[in-house]
Amino acid sequence: MRVAAFHAGLSAERRAAAYLIAKGYRILARRFRTPYGEIDIVARRRQLLAFVEVKARRSLDDAAYAVTRKQQQRIINAAQAWLMAHPEHETFEFRFDAMLIAPRRLPRHLLGAFDAST
């Protein structure tokens, strides 16, 4: 079960990355791991960085509810670590997005799905 979930997650991340590229983003990192958490995708478009959490579920609604407050905090902490490791991006604006993936549906990109102040 865990192996199947892992592969499903990788497939969802590939779909999300392809969707972002089609929207004009450049993928800077995938599966960026820190002691604080993991970021599925770090993407850039112009002077904007998007830290993207990818969620794959049976429906887009189920995927939307899968990003918990605890996960959000881990992603925020990991993003801070990413920014410290990449000072060349310190002047960029950034936001936290979610990419929702469901079978036989186009991905749904939620811009600014959460922020660091919540």
Swiss-Prot record:
A Pfam family this chain is assigned to: UPF0102
Molecular functions (GO terms): nucleic acid binding
Recorded superkingdom: Bacteria
Xref: InterPro entries: Restrct_endonuc-II-like (IPR011335), tRNA_endonuc-like_dom_sf (IPR011856), UPF0102_YraN-like (IPR003509)
Coiled coil: none
Entry's family note: Belongs to the UPF0102 family.
PANTHER family, A to Z: UPF0102 PROTEIN YRAN
HAMAP family per UniProt: UPF0102 (MF_00048)
Name used for this protein in its record: UPF0102 protein Nwi_0116
Origin species: Nitrobacter winogradskyi (strain ATCC 25391 / DSM 10237 / CIP 104748 / NCIMB 11846 / Nb-255)
